[in-house]
Amino acid sequence: MIQQAQFNVQMAEEDRWLTQYPNMEMIVNNKGPKPIFPELNFNITGLEEKSRYVVLLSIQKFDNIRYGFKNGKWGPSKVRHATKKEQEIKYFLHPDGTKLGEELMKETIKFDTVRITNHKKFMDKDNVFFVETMHKYVPVLTVKNITNVESANHSMRMEVAQFFPVTVYNQESIGNWKSKFHKNATFENRLDGGNKRKNTNSREEPSSKRSKNETEIAVLDILQVASQSENYNESTNSGRLQNEISSSIHQFPSTSYQNQYPHAYPTVNTPPIYAQQFPAPFDEKQNQFYPKTDENLAPNCAQDASSLPNFAMNQKASFANQYPYHPYYHQYSQLDHGSPYQYMNNSINSDSSFQSSFSTENSYFDDNGNPIHYPYYPYK
């Protein structure tokens, strides 16, 4: 427990820090900022309950000594000396911002997003602290009472959490110990001779990253399939990308699935398929609509609701979010005899943007479940 007159602070994971105290090591390298493990989590007591506070964290040098690792031990280096330039102290404000003292004392204050690096090119982020290898560092917690602006800042050096930044673990036991608790812990260790090795108990995981050539080939394959799509209709500039683009995509039986769920196979620039877009009678035997001709149009362009399949009648209610009303279509109304029909705004005839972005053709399906495009017939 670290104490001061105003309040008390304790590391939430103090037991883990003590297992390697005072020689904890943290990996840093040129691959990017690295997390600190065990994490920097704190419990605070002794605050004024109704005052508001901000909590800040900094990573500061423990001393001005340059260390070395020899004969299995850390100690002051007899060959190299510490840098004389003083390091600028950087503070990281806790993401939660201001909180009441009673709130801070009820919860664990976590700085799990803090990272460290030994390359200044990664210093552009607020949560990244620059550290030098072969030096010892200590986290410092600062608590500021912003309700009473005249009160002084109070800082705590969390000496139980002191650590050495290293590019590889000098103590093999630390790498093994961290791997038990932290899934991202590295197994790299340094032998007495200065060589790197991987822990023999670790298993090599196959890389999931594609090489540049593999990625380019995959992209070309997708573009080739898209350009050769059999369902591409040049006359209406409509088509859809085949499921065969990737063998990992689940394949559905095309005929039965399209007949039951035509919304799952939409075509580009084609209106949503609603019941009101099928004024032609439905052939139950062939499971499709009759070709839309003047003879097959329902009288007065009113649909015979009983001739429509259930999936068409229920589409609007079942898939309202996927297929909202198009702005050029009015809402549906009822004729005196109760059959629904559709209004259309005549402004589409003079609206070039509409004609270029929205086709007035409807999609039906043939015996094989493939879309058939019929021209739009104006109502009588």
Swiss-Prot record:
Source organism superkingdom: Eukaryota
Gene Ontology molecular function: DNA-binding transcription factor activity, RNA polymerase II-specific; RNA polymerase II cis-regulatory region sequence-specific DNA binding
Regions recorded as binding DNA: 11-192
Region (Disordered): 188-215
Alphabetical UniProt keywords: DNA-binding, Nucleus, Transcription, Transcription regulation
Signal sequence annotation: none
Basic and acidic residues bias spans: 189-215
The keyword GTP-binding is annotated on this UniProt entry: no
Localization: Nucleus
Swiss-Prot/TrEMBL GO biological process terms: cell fate specification; positive regulation of DNA-templated transcription; regulation of transcription by RNA polymerase II
Gene Ontology, cellular component aspect: chromatin; nucleus
Main location: nucleus
Protein name: Putative T-box protein 40
Designated gene of the protein: tbx-40
